[in-house]
Curated annotation (Swiss-Prot):
Stated name of the protein: Patatin-like protein 5
Span(s) of short sequence motif DGA/G: 215-217
Induction notes from the record: By auxin.
Domain PNPLA span(s) in chain numbering: 22-228
Entry keyword set: Hydrolase, Lipid degradation, Lipid metabolism, Phosphoprotein, Plant defense
Post-translational modification: Phosphorylated at Ser-399 by CPK3. Phosphorylation enhances PLP5 activity towards phosphatidylcholine.
Alphabetical list of Gene3D superfamilies matching this protein: Cytosolic phospholipase A2 catalytic domain
Species this protein is from: Arabidopsis thaliana (Mouse-ear cress)
Residues recorded as bearing Phosphoserine in the entry: S399
InterPro entries from the UniProt entry: Acyl_Trfase/lysoPLipase (IPR016035), PNPLA_dom (IPR002641)
Region (Disordered): 393-414
Domain notes: The nitrogen atoms of the two glycine residues in the GGXR motif define the oxyanion hole, and stabilize the oxyanion that forms during the nucleophilic attack by the catalytic serine during substrate cleavage.
Molecular function, one GO term: phospholipase activity
Function: Possesses non-specific lipolytic acyl hydrolase (LAH) activity. Catalyzes the hydrolysis of the neutral lipids monogalactosyldiacylglycerol (MGDG), digalactosyldiacylglycerol (DGDG) and phosphatidylglycerol (PG), and less efficiently the polar lipids phosphatidylcholine (PC) and phosphatidylinositol (PI), but not the storage lipid triacylglycerol (TAG). May play a role in root development.
Amino acid sequence: MENESPSKKNMPPSCGTLVTILSLDGGGVRGIIAGVILAYLEKQLQELDGEHVRVADYFDVIAGTSTGGLVTAMLTAPDENGRPRFAAKEIVPFYLEHCPKIFPQPTGVLALLPKLPKLLSGPKYSGNYLRTTLGKLLGETKLRQTLTNVVIPTFDIKTLQPTIFSSYQALTDPSLDVKVSDICIGTSAAPTYFPPYYFSNEDSQGKTRHFNLVDGGVTANNPTLVAMTAVTKQIVNNNPDMGTLNPLGYDQFLVISIGTGSAKKEERYSAKKAAKWGIISWLYEDGTTPILDITFESSRDIVHYHSSVVFKALQSEDKYLRIDDDTLEGDASTLDLSTKSNLENLIKLGEKMLTNRVMQMNIDTGTYEPAAENINNDEQLKRFAKILSEERKLRRKRSDKMTKDSSIGSQEIK
């Protein structure tokens, strides 16, 4: 069995043949679904390479939005031994323990009171428990210290622009090398659910940068393209880690994109119905938040559409796997229902998603259809795990050879 270097980052793409990306959608409590799928993926990797390996050992970039940003941090934040603080199998227990406190449900008389007055006077939840928990969980870990490169989208409401936190940028722009806990709080601050999050960061030159953040889902609820763009930027900037990759060489990208499910296409809203809405109804209508539903769903689906077109055009559909389910019904489709029964149901839905047939987007209609090959998501994840394992072994072999050749060259010079 191979020994792991305690705090060494993964061998870069220049040592291999692929750029490997893991993307994790937002979705509130539905992040537990991604936890189920990631636990399965990590188990497949461990069967190939040993119990010591973790998901972060295999990806050049892990990107996450909102709840996906939290999972990204759990997978990549180092412990005292320089290894991932959490195994993927620990994500589900974490959600079961903490979601009921992050999203406390009203009980007794409070449960009977209308929710609208509360929403008009402030966010639905204070966010205090979330901030405290993330502070304890991630401590002083900075963005540049993650065990592989991470990309986490947020949106700054003061500048009205996305702020993309990237390990790559943190190395070149110290003002963006902030605490991972602050990033996670910011990317999870869904409007109407949690208050916007303010913090500042002072770099070594005394330059202070201010952040006024809300949920990254308003700009990129599915961060797949954001991650691909971050890598492309490094190629354009001639980052030596990227080797000889072409900026448009997406055929050399291997992408696993994990969704958190969405409501069944039940035509909940219509132009006729919405024509009568004012500001209040757009914010709250029959227990839903239409403006957020529309924003999150559109940013999620347009990314999958674009990614599907790109990989199909390059005849590389076999290197792009999207696991999601757009048939969730009732409580399962909510962002914040943290009851034990709903969380346990979401776990079952995650397990069901694994055995579902692989779905691909019809680029003409924009709808999901079964893939041409009769294969399930779990079988496809096994195939991707083998590719990831082979790529990692190749990189380590080439890196060892380069180190050996460099050592011989140094001895000859002496």
